[in-house]
Design a protein with these regions (language model features):
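Mixed-charge, low-complexity intrinsically disordered regions
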Residues: 1-33, 40-42, 46-108
Length: 108
């Protein structure tokens, strides 16, 4: 397997994050750098701690530990259709993630 965002052990990855209950840093969804807990069950992004809910969510696969909002978090897809459940969603790519996002879309 190619060394990419799916290679476990990376401390940081560029991921797709969609707030199913509202906005995320002024957009419905964002693509940006995240870090993980040592157990890989918590994703950290923009000061938020998103805990994996393992199929117990209604619309998402992670929940914000502080606000209770549900999130859909996934890897970057080459075709760009990262939105969960085929929804029309506006996505903003963080400035510091643009180069890596383009590389991932080409390699995927």
């Amino acid at each position: 397997m190619k060394a990419n965002q799916l290679t476990q052990g990376d401390e940081r990855r560029v991921m797709y994050l969609e707030n199913k209950d509202g906005q995320l840093e002024g957009a419905q969804a964002r693509i940006g750098w995240v870090t993980f807990s040592t157990t890989w069950r918590t994703v950290y992004y923009a000061g938020r701690s998103l805990k994996a809910i393992g199929g117990r969510g209604v619309r998402g696969n992670f929940i914000d530990e502080q606000s209770g909002e549900e999130f859909w978090v996934s890897g970057i897809k080459k075709r760009g259709s990262n939105a969960h459940a085929n929804e029309s969603t506006s996505v903003v790519v963080d400035d510091d993630a643009k180069d890596e996002h383009e590389r991932l879309r080409q390699d995927a």
